[in-house]
Each structure stands twice: as C-alpha cells, then as structure tokens.
C-alpha cells in the first residue's frame, strides 16, 4: 500500500500542479522529489511519458515510463519508484539497476523476480532487441558494470553478434582496447541507426558527441542517408568523401549509401578500383554460398558503373589482370551492359528524393543480364 506522501505526489504529478512555479520553489521541489531534469515532473497518461518542466512528450529528453523507473532506481528515489510502478512500469527493469540492498529489496516488494538477475538477463537483452527499446537498453546496461560482468565472455559476444557482424563497431578503435561498456553502447547506437530510430539517435548524439564521426561512418555503411544528411549538413560532421565511399561499398547492395557519397562528390573510379581489389571470385568457396557472395559483390560493381565509374581505365584493367580473374575480364568485355544508367546521372541530396530515384532505378535496371552472365561464368569456372 502506498503512503499518503506517495499518493499526494502521484496526484501532483498527474495534474502537473507545479507547471507554473517560482524560482524560490525549485529547491523545495527538488527536496520533495518532484523535480525532473529541467523542471517539475509531469506524466502523460496517454503517451506514458515522464517529462520535466515545459517539455513535451515528443521532446528528445522525455522519458518512457520504464526509462523513468530505471532513472528513479539509480537515484534511489523510493517514492517515484512506487509511483512509476503503479502507473505500469516493469519492475524487473528496475532491479537490474538497483545500487543498494534497500532499493533492490523495494523492487522485490513491488513484484520483481528475486531470481531475475540470475536467470533473466539474456532473455531481457533479446527482448529489448525485438522491441527496439534502444534508450531503455542503454539506460540499463551502460555504466552498469555489475550487470555487464555477470555475462560470461562467450554469452556477451553471442549477444553482440545476435543481429550484426561486429565490423562497424570497431571502426574507430581496436577490438582489444574496447571495453564491454563501450561495446554495448555502440551496439545499441548502431541498432538505432540501422532501424532509423530518430529519437534515440538524436538523444545519443547529444549525450555522446565523441561518437559523432563513428555515427556518420555507421550511417554510411548501413545506408541510412537521412542520418548522413543530418550529420553532414545540419551538424557539419565531416569525413573524407572517398573514405565515406569505401565504407558504403563495403556493404553489399548498399545503393543508397553509395549513391549519396557519389552525390556528395566521391571519386567513382577510385571506388570501383577498391571494389575490384576486393574481388573474391577466385576464393575457394563452393555452391550457393559462393554465388550469393559474388552476386552481392557484383551488384556494387555494377551500380558504381551505372553511376558513371569507368571500368576501362588502365588502373582497373591492370588490377583485373593482377587478380588473374578471367571471369572479370570476360564480364568487363561486355560493353553493352556496362554503361552509365540515365536515371542515376543527376546528383540529388534530399534523402526522400534519393529513395524515389533509387526505387525507379531498381524497377528499370538491367543488372540481371549482367548477373546471369556472371553466374554462368562462375559455374563454368568450377
């Protein structure tokens, strides 16, 4: 049963009784636990969002109810913990962040599973992935060393690899130098960029500005051109255009990322040279796996040529010969299917217009004869 004090706070928060306050009231509100970040705490029953001061539910700094609970648990705010649980917050999220025995015991009293920390951590991580709860996951795991250490090394890296290969996580620092704390932060940050979760991205970019370059790199690699546009033009974050293009080409089928780097001014011939140097046709891979790899690789080669890259430069021809790839030599001899595509020749930087153009291109492209020929040549080379 909640105390009169808790019930009173609950009513005051729900009615936003302190939406108008005097500066002299701030200290009192803080001492009473009625202050949230930048102003008196408020709660929207419809959106299930906890706010501070005049912020709206859509504000980047507003909190979903479960996140608000985690924050209250970390700060040992007993009354707020009770209030948030009464509104429907999941108490097991709270027990994962309890720093004191008293707060942990309170979580158990409010319904948390005493064995959750022993048996529920793995499933909770997977649940947060499925629900795309990026900010909640970061609130729970980041700087929560006791929780991170409770995963053995194998389980932890299985979780990190659950959705991704880890290539992009180590772009800006060596694997052996990265702490679990940083790795889990970048895992969820990358997740937000991959699924284009705008609010989490904006929140994290504000909180972790030291990852700005990495954020741009990740957006390029994943083809999130909305985020590339935002970082490049609204935040003035810069990378070498050719480095950006190499990142875009490193992901198979990344038409959006490749096109956007081209539109910004990256050198297409250098990109094609890099792609050719990555050629894996001569590797000993058999069956459908080999064809899948080659198809993905060739799609980027073909797209760069469609944008205007010249496959007949001396350097590219020399690279093909050095790779001893008869298949690439034969493919590049088919000049009728290796030419710029008319749909792709305009340089457009508005993300929505780029998507429309790429969609039009995909409905008209002639990649399939090229790919069919490649498959035929690969099969003949076996």
From Swiss-Prot:
Family: Belongs to the asfivirus MGF 360 family.
Stored InterPro entries: ASFV_MGF360 (IPR002595)
One GO BP: taxis
Function per UniProt: Plays a role in virus cell tropism, and may be required for efficient virus replication in macrophages.
UniProt-listed Pfam families: ASFV_360
The protein, known as: Protein MGF 360-4L
Domain of life the protein comes from: Viruses
């Amino acid at each position: 049963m909640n105390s009169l004090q808790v019930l009173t706070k609950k009513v005051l928060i729900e009615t936003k009784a302190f939406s108008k306050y005097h500066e002299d009231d701030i200290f009192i509100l803080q001492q009473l636990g009625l202050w949230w970040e930048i102003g008196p705490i408020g709660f929207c029953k419809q959106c299930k969002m906890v706010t501070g001061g005049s912020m709206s539910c859509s504000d980047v700094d507003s909190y979903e109810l479960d996140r608000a609970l985690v924050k209250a648990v970390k700060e040992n705010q007993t009354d707020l913990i009770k209030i948030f649980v009464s509104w429907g917050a999941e108490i097991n999220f709270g027990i994962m962040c309890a720093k004191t025995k008293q707060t942990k015991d309170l979580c158990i009293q409010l319904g948390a599973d005493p064995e959750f920390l022993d048996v529920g951590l793995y499933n909770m991580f997977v649940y947060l992935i499925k629900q795309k709860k990026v900010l909640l996951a970061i609130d729970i795991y980041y700087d929560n060393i006791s929780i991170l250490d409770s995963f053995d090394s194998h389980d932890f890296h299985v979780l990190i690899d659950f959705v991704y290969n880890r290539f992009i996580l180590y772009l800006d620092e060596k694997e052996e130098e990265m702490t679990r704390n940083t790795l889990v932060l970048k895992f969820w940050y990358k997740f937000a960029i991959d699924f284009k979760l705008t609010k989490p991205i904006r929140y994290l970019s504000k909180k972790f500005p030291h990852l700005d370059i990495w954020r741009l790199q990740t957006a390029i690699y994943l083809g999130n051109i909305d985020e590339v546009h935002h970082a490049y033009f609204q935040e003035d974050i810069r990378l070498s255009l050719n480095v950006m293009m190499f990142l875009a080409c490193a992901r198979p089928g990344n038409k959006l990322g490749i096109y956007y780097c081209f539109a910004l001014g990256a050198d297409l011939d250098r990109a094609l040279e890099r792609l050719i140097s990555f050629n894996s046709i001569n590797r000993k891979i058999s069956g459908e796996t080999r064809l899948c790899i080659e198809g993905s690789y060739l799609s980027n080669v073909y797209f760069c040529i469609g944008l205007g890259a010249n496959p007949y430069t001396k350097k590219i021809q020399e690279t093909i010969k050095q790779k001893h790839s008869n298949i690439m030599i034969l493919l590049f001899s088919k000049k009728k299917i290796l030419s710029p595509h008319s749909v792709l020749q305009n340089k457009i930087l508005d993300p929505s217009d780029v998507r429309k153009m790429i969609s039009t291109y995909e409905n008209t492209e002639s990649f399939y004869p090229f790919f069919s020929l490649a498959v035929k040549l690969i099969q003949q080379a076996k």
